[in-house]
């Protein structure tokens, strides 16, 4: 069969490879001039920067894409596990290193607060049990009809997840120490949610880091995009770049998706898998006579969106890789207040920031004697933060100064401004324009209880035959391992339909 995949981000690349490995003719259409989507790369002034995701968690999910296609993952990506997850800075003289080794972890916890290990381990155990339930009964399955969700098994297993509790509540149930609470709560921002609003299940990230480890891909995270692109090439997939999709064509008589309009041309296909940002697709790519019924264009703005980010890619003329970790977090003096600012639409003058220094793990990513630094500052998305004008150069200059001041609170970056030789920024406006991410959201639809599992945009269209959706705003959600899972379960359903002649 001839299959179209819209979008050459990690979801589209993984899905296309899986389909092609089953013997089908696959074409990927990508609007930009390179593959990767949000898993993008910037090469500038001799530095190589990952532009989007940077942390490799759940490596088996990465490997599975290649092995499921009959290939050896080691021929495409080079993975290695990190001994230390990150350094965390609470203030200038207060730094802790978070290890994966349990003995070292205990020492770290006890140094923060004697006796805190028991509560922390109880938290990890509870979350791991919830994760296994969620993975088996909710995350790794699709919901094609109401009875797939509304049944006794889902009711019983869902009750065990205690989804009405928020992430903050679960953390505070086990952890009394404010520093350790910050360590756990901050990571919900990795998928763009407010720990006060996100279901308690979304406190799984620290557990995943501890249980499965954190890894690094040689060449940076973009090495995964390159590996997937090579996998697709080896499987005979055709990737068309600079291919802007104008519309998904719906046959009004048979209510099926049978073509796409791309760069002015109508291209016929047997099935279409769309991995572009779902809200933008529902708003702009469906014909007027054939909207997605649950998500018509006029309702898209009313959905809840994850936060965005202001990113800086900084090159400095000194090598500091022996003084920092690969991953680093510098906390705001008012962590809870900063969270409120992000989700209430206000800019912070004292943000918590994430700092990634890729040359710590791969020297080839920066010129000799120099260091590339990636800084992420969570911000409101464009709807909640409608009063923020990201096109205002004076504003972006002010935010850069805020970030440089925050970096300068740790010793290694005290004099960073005098060493800058390269600087690039990426704003919420850029997320919207470059990736068609609605409201510049960095992680798609926010996974609130009302926008999760059965209540999230589904992988198989309920309105039109031969139309499928995958990606961060669809089930099961955002984050690289999760969108790779989205690709897998969506392709599994497509292959079942093909085998049944549906």
UniProtKB/Swiss-Prot annotation:
One of the GO biological process terms: carotenoid biosynthetic process
What pathway or pathways are given for this protein in its record?
A: Carotenoid biosynthesis; staphyloxanthin biosynthesis; staphyloxanthin from farnesyl diphosphate: step 2/5
Q: EC number(s) in its UniProt entry? A: 1.3.8.-
Spans through the membrane: none
Q: Name one GO molecular function term.
A: 4,4'-diapophytoene desaturase (4,4'-diaponeurosporene-forming)
Any signal peptide, and if so, which residues? none
Query: Top-level EC class, please?
Result: oxidoreductase
Function of the molecule: Involved in the biosynthesis of the yellow-orange carotenoid staphyloxanthin, which plays a role in the virulence via its protective function against oxidative stress. Catalyzes three successive dehydrogenation reactions that lead to the introduction of three double bonds into 4,4'-diapophytoene (dehydrosqualene), with 4,4'-diapophytofluene and 4,4'-diapo-zeta-carotene as intermediates, and 4,4'-diaponeurosporene (the major deep-yellow pigment in staphylococci strains) as the end product.
What's the protein called, per UniProt?
4,4'-diapophytoene desaturase (4,4'-diaponeurosporene-forming)
What is the source species? Staphylococcus aureus (strain COL)
């Amino acid at each position: 069969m001839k299959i179209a995949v819209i979008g050459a981000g990690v979801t589209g690349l993984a899905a296309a490879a899986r389909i092609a490995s089953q013997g089908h003719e696959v074409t990927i259409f990508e609007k930009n001039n390179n593959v990767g989507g949000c898993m993008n790369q910037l090469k500038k002034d001799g530095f190589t920067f990952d532009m989007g995701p940077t942390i490799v968690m759940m490596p088996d999910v990465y490997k599975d894409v290649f092995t499921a296609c009959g290939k050896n993952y080691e021929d495409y990506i080079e993975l290695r596990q990190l001994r230390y997850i990150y350094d965390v800075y609470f203030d200038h003289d207060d730094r802790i290193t978070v290890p994966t080794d349990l003995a070292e972890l205990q020492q770290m916890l006890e140094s923060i607060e004697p006796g805190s290990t028991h509560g922390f381990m109880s938290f990890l155990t509870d979350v791991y049990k919830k994760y296994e339930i969620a993975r088996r009964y909710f995350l790794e399955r699709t919901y094609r009809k109401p009875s797939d969700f509304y049944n006794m098994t889902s009711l019983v297993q869902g009750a065990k997840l205690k989804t009405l509790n928020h992430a903050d509540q679960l953390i505070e149930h086990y952890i009394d120490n404010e520093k350790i609470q910050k360590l756990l709560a901050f990571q919900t921002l990795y998928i763009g949610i407010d720990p006060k609003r996100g279901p308690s299940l979304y406190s799984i990230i620290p557990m995943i880091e501890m249980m499965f480890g954190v890894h690094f891909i040689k060449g940076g995270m973009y090495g995964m995009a390159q590996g997937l692109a090579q996998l697709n090439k080896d499987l005979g997939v055709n990737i068309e770049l600079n291919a802007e999709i104008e519309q998904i064509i719906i046959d009004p008589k048979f209510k099926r998706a049978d073509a796409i309009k791309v760069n002015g041309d109508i291209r016929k296909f047997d099935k279409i898998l769309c991995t572009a940002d779902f809200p933008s697709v529902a708003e702009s790519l469906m014909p007027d006579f054939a909207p997605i019924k649950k998500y018509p264009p006029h309702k898209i703005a009313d959905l809840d969106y994850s936060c965005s980010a202001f990113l800086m890619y900084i090159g400095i003329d000194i090598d500091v890789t022996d003084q920092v970790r690969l991953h680093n977090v510098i906390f705001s003096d008012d962590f809870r207040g900063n969270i409120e600012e992000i989700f209430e639409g206000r800019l912070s003058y004292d943000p918590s920031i994430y700092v990634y220094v890729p040359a710590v793990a791969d020297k080839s990513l920066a010129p000799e004697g120099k260091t590339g630094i990636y800084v992420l500052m969570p911000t409101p998305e464009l709807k909640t933060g409608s009063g923020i004008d990201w096109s205002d150069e004076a504003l972006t200059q002010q935010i850069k100064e805020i970030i440089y001041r925050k970096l300068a609170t740790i010793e290694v970056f005290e004099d960073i401004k005098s060493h800058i030789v390269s600087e690039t920024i990426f704003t919420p406006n850029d997320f919207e324009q470059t990736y068609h991410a609605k409201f510049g959201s960095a992680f798609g639809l926010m996974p609130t209880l009302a926008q999760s599992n059965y209540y999230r945009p589904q992988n198989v269209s309920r309105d039109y035959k031969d139309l499928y959706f995958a990606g961060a705003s669809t089930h099961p959600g955002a984050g690289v391992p999760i969108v790779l899972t989205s690709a897998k379960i969506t392709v599994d359903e497509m292959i079942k339909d093909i085998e049944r002649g549906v």
